[in-house]
């Protein structure tokens, strides 16, 4: 699947992913009204509204982009009907030949981690049949529990030729509370360095140590185009850390959240990529799906919300392209 993602990026010239993170406050009144008239002001009505909203955006942008990234929590809040809308969205995007990155951020161990992996990437045994669950192409994974949590996902990826993006340096403001903590390397934590003869050691931030582990994992499952099926999540809001991690994880594709509404711009992104404009894919969610609520795109109005989303995609592609041109890439 990493091969397909790269091919789609090359075909579209757009190293971007649209985050399908619907909130009811983003859904135009006419869509909410139609959904509620059919199914009432219920969880079913809300799920129908976000599905119709998503479909409109997909229909207007699928020819411009390689991938989408639905955030499952935005669907889970509407219970089982919301999860059905999530699945419907995944399936529709795949019909449009888009790569689907399920933003699920799962993290557990053993059989539980394996069950998460099967639910979203693999197939479950049901009697004599093998049945796919949500069936995304990639998912995001939380590595806090270590290899016990990540390896089951890698195993399913190998079986299904799918991939994962592991959280390394996230875009949120408080990420540094843990991810930037300095840890001693080269000696066991707590050891008196003066008593360790001839061993060099230094302090590294936790995100860099996680990045080194991702680089190790990535070697287990390489694609045909120089990149692994095992990628990383690194926020656009931390470009200097991104520059470091690009070197630490040379074979891992980087999923880059934080563009647009969170403050990231095209010029913040250039060091996430290799010299061929590959190696990263940049996410924008509400900056695209709720573009019509932005003054810049207000001329489109709520009725033409999806046209506003299309224009926001075009503007994002242009912004990133101009950033590349400034450094001759």
Whereabouts are the PLM-identified features?
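Conserved anion-binding
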Residues: 108-230
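Acidic (Asp/Glu)-rich catalytic clusters
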Residues: 58-64, 92-95, 154-160, 246-249, ...
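C-terminal helical cap(s) of enzyme catalytic domains, especially alpha/beta-barrels
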Residues: 269-275, 290-329
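N-terminal active-site wall of soluble small-molecule enzyme domains
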Residues: 64-66, 70-132, 241
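Short, well-ordered coil/turn segments that N-cap beta-strands
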Residues: 12-16, 63-66, 96-98, 134-137, ...
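N-terminal glycine-rich anion-binding loop in soluble enzyme alpha/beta folds
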Residues: 1-60, 300
């Amino acid at each position: 699947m990493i091969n397909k993602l790269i091919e789609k990026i090359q075909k579209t010239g757009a190293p971007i992913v649209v985050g399908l993170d619907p909130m009811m406050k983003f859904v135009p009144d006419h869509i909410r009204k139609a959904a509620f008239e059919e199914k009432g002001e219920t969880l079913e009505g809300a799920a129908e509204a976000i599905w119709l909203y998503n479909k409109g955006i997909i229909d207007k942008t699928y020819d411009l982009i390689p991938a989408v990234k639905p955030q499952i929590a935005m669907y889970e809040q509407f219970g089982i009907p919301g999860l059905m809308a999530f699945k419907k969205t995944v399936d529709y995007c795949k019909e449009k030949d888009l790569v689907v990155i399920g933003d699920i951020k799962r993290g557990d161990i053993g059989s539980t981690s394996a069950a998460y992996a099967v639910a979203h990437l693999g197939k479950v045994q049901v009697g004599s049949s093998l049945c796919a669950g949500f069936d995304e192409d990639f998912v995001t994974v939380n590595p806090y529990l270590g290899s016990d949590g990540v390896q089951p996902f890698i195993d399913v990826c190998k079986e299904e030729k799918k991939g994962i993006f592991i959280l390394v340096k996230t875009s949120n403001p408080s990420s540094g509370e843990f991810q930037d903590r300095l840890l001693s390397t080269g000696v066991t934590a707590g050891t008196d360095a003066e008593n360790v003869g001839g061993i060099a050691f230094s302090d590294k931030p936790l995100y860099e140590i996680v990045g080194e582990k991702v680089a190790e994992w990535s070697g287990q499952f390489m694609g045909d185009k120089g990149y692994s099926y095992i990628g990383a999540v690194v926020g656009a809001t931390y470009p200097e850390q991104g520059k470091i991690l690009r070197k630490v994880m040379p074979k891992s594709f980087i999923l880059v959240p934080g563009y647009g509404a969170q403050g990231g711009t095209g010029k913040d992104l250039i060091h996430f990529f290799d010299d061929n404009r590959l190696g990263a894919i940049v996410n924008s969610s509400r900056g695209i799906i709720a573009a019509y609520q932005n003054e810049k795109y207000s001329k489109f109005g709520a009725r033409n919300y999806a046209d506003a989303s299309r224009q926001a995609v075009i503007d994002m592609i242009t912004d990133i392209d101009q950033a590349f041109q400034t450094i001759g890439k």
